[in-house]
Regions:
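Short, well-ordered alpha-helical segments enriched in acidic and aromatic residues
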Residues: 69-81, 190-193
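Bacterial N-terminal signal peptides
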Residues: 11-25
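Flexible, glycine-rich surface segments
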Residues: 179-284
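C-terminal soluble interaction/assembly domains
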Residues: 269-322, 336-337
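Boundary at the C-terminal end of the N-terminal hydrophobic targeting segment
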Residues: 24-34
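Surface-exposed, charged secondary-structure patches
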Residues: 81-131, 233, 237-240, 245-253, ...
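Short, low-complexity N-terminal intrinsically disordered segments enriched in polar/charged residues
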Residues: 33-67, 148-174, 178
Length: 337
């Protein structure tokens, strides 16, 4: 039986579409992709592309998103849009782009502001979701006002990623509890998993492959591999904007004080997880930690968040960490069921 972590993340297929329009706003092509190629770098320094009509601007955006055309998006949004079309999570970005394009093909409409004829808004989908970046008329041409939309887009994306990270932390606790309810690898003792993906031939992680090739463990292979990438910090792709790391000990501020979770090679003293944004103030702001009691704490570790998390070995929720009660809206989770 898979844990609710699997159910929750599997449901993000639908939630991803919902949050694209509720929180994330626009697709965010890979940060490395937008900066690493000479063509993209050259485009980002050029003047922003203009259009004869707001309808032409909207059509160009929809086509660029549908084709996942990073250079075209940089042209359309200009230098002020560079940040919000850049992310460390290209897999999710492409998925978000596909969802946006699908909604745009479902229905799209450009409306002129009745109080300002030089300002237009693109509405997409049957629910007429408004793009947070307005289209404005300057000197006889129409442009996307990227500077105005930038902060709102980043705010929505960060909020979405942080809520996902909190839910994954909570699901990790449930998965560990399910794992420890059985004895694995003929160890003769109930213990917690020290890994996300098991060593080949063993059941020492939250996911493993059975001898007949079928998946085993409290989480699915897809979820395990996605989180494992974040756990290792060795891949350019984060999972929903966050990296994750299993902690194998706790500090003096944790319940029962400082102790090691691993005793003679067996993790029986507890477990903990840290979730850190892949790009500070781009994919997330807060870092989250959770222990075996299931309480998620948050803290803004600043621009050096990722290095602090890399070096973090113990779960230590001192007074600088604060409990979070942030959750996905009930209606969003209900739609994921």
């Amino acid at each position: 039986m898979k844990s609710k972590l699997s159910d929750f993340i599997a449901g993000l297929g639908l939630c991803g579409i919902l949050t694209t329009f509720l929180f994330c706003a626009l697709p965010a092509p890979a940060h490395s992709q937008s900066q690493s190629t000479p063509k993209a770098a050259a485009i980002s320094s050029q003047a922003q592309k203009s259009f004869s009509t707001p309808q032409d601007a909207a059509a160009a955006l929809i086509q660029a998103v549908e084709n996942y055309d990073v250079p075209a998006l940089l042209e359309i949004f200009g230098p002020d849009g560079k940040d919000f079309i850049s992310s460390a999570d290209p897999v999710r970005d492409k998925s978000v782009g596909a969802a946006f394009a699908a909604k745009a093909h479902e229905k799209n409409l450009v409306t002129i502001d009745p109080k300002n004829p030089a300002r237009a808004i693109l509405l997409v989908g049957n629910n007429d979701w408004p793009l947070p970046v307005p289209i404005v008329k300057k000197r006889g041409k129409w442009y996307f006002e990227s500077k105005e939309g930038r902060d709102e887009i980043l705010f929505r994306r960060i909020g979405s990623n942080e809520l996902d990270a909190i839910q994954i932390c909570r699901g990790f606790v449930e998965a560990q509890q399910e794992y420890a309810s059985e004895v694995h690898d003929e160890s003769g003792i109930n213990q917690y998993a020290q890994r996300i993906i098991s060593t080949p031939g063993k059941h020492d992680g939250l996911y493993w492959q059975n001898q007949d090739g079928t998946p085993g463990g409290p989480i699915s292979e897809g979820i395990a591999r996605a989180i494992e990438e974040g756990y290792t910090f060795s891949k350019p792709s984060a999972y929903h904007g966050y990296y994750f790391k299993v902690l194998k000990g706790q500090g003096p501020s944790a319940p029962l004080g400082q102790l090691d979770y691993v005793i003679e090679g067996v993790m029986i003293g507890g477990f903990a997880l840290v979730a850190v944004p892949a790009e500070y103030r781009v994919t997330g702001v807060k870092t989250f930690i959770v222990g075996y009691d299931g309480i998620v704490y948050q803290k803004d570790l600043g621009p050096d968040s990722i290095n602090i998390a890399k070096n973090m070995e113990r779960y230590n929720p001192d007074k600088t960490w604060h409990r979070t009660d942030d959750q996905w809206p009930a209606e969003v989770l209900a739609n994921a069921d």
